[in-house]
Amino acid sequence: MTRLENDTFIRALLRQPVDYTPVWMMRQAGRYLPEYNQTRARAGDFLALCKNPALATEVTLQPLDRFPLDAAILFSDILTIPDAMGLGLYFSTGEGPRFERPLREEREIHSLIVPDPGTHLRYVMDAVTEIRKALNNRVPLIGFSGSPFTLACYMVEGASSNDYRQIKTMLYTRPDLLHHILEVTAQAVIVYLNAQIEAGAQAVMIFDSWGGALSHAAYQEFSLRYMTQIMEGLKREHDSERIPNILFTKGGGLWLESIMASGCDAIGLDWTIDIGEARRRTQDKVALQGNLDPAVLFSSPEAIAAEVGKILASYGHGHGHVFNLGHGISQFTPPENAKTLVETVHMQSVHYHQVS
């Protein structure tokens, strides 16, 4: 058992009393920080940075050295699993991630195997271990994975997509093939996240970035079903410590009750739903994470403080809230505005945790 200097984030996820609302930011180690860009240049490219545990550790800690954040998140990419499956991940300048061998043929789909994280994804586990050591129990470390459906989107489309034409065609014409991809990928995510926990991750998060593109029925069948499988297979305790988990579907505000039923400890919210409404609907049975529009960070300190105040007031008194953005921080965000966000959350939230 290790004693964290700051366990506010873990306590909030477990809906335990805290003195203030903890805060971290999705993509907090990223291109908006000059020091990140310098480290990335040393690595050569983004993928080389992800696969170098020493440099991944360096960039993971950079935002914590600037801001009083309450958690660190592993610096990696959601597409490590399909890359380890042999699809050939690469990054094109200005185009984002792409796969050399997207899944289009039935034979390729049925040959998918669950990669061994101890061999094919060793660099991720080494990074988790190194980051934990470098953090020296300052704050907890979050591990993560993409959701099966979001990973499948990239695996079938071969890249980002505006219309999801390839995967939705498969969904409606050959659902059996898509279910096979999702089944294998769900098992891979379980093994991958449990390996991260064994290596030192103290909480884990599933990013369902593209689940919100599905219809109501399709979301239940092709996204949430497999995330529920993951919830059932995840380690909930390691070294006598609870390992909480967060499930985030971008555009998932329609399905909060169903997401809660998956068995997750916390639901991540994007900025399109009022957090107070989300709290009423989930009845304090799960923690909530979110949900500032990242574009607010392009505005003034006064506007940032006002928008933070609205979210804190909407959530209201009591525990179970982790403040975050509703999606990843933009590369164009002034770092001083991120600092304003973190400090404002800490300062304004104390009021909501005081016992009257």
Curated annotation (Swiss-Prot):
It comes from Nitrosomonas eutropha (strain DSM 101675 / C91 / Nm57). It catalyses: uroporphyrinogen III + 4 H(+) = coproporphyrinogen III + 4 CO2. The gene is hemE. GO terms for biological process: protoporphyrinogen IX biosynthetic process from glutamate. Homodimer. Transmembrane segments: none annotated. Catalyzes the decarboxylation of four acetate groups of uroporphyrinogen-III to yield coproporphyrinogen-III. GO terms for molecular function: uroporphyrinogen decarboxylase activity. It is found in: Cytoplasm. This is Uroporphyrinogen decarboxylase. Pathway: Porphyrin-containing compound metabolism; protoporphyrin-IX biosynthesis; coproporphyrinogen-III from 5-aminolevulinate: step 4/4. Belongs to the uroporphyrinogen decarboxylase family. The record marks D77 as: Transition state stabilizer. HAMAP family: URO_D. Its EC number is 4.1.1.37. It comes from the Bacteria. The keyword rRNA-binding does not apply. GO terms for cellular component: cytosol. SUPFAM superfamilies: UROD/MetE-like.
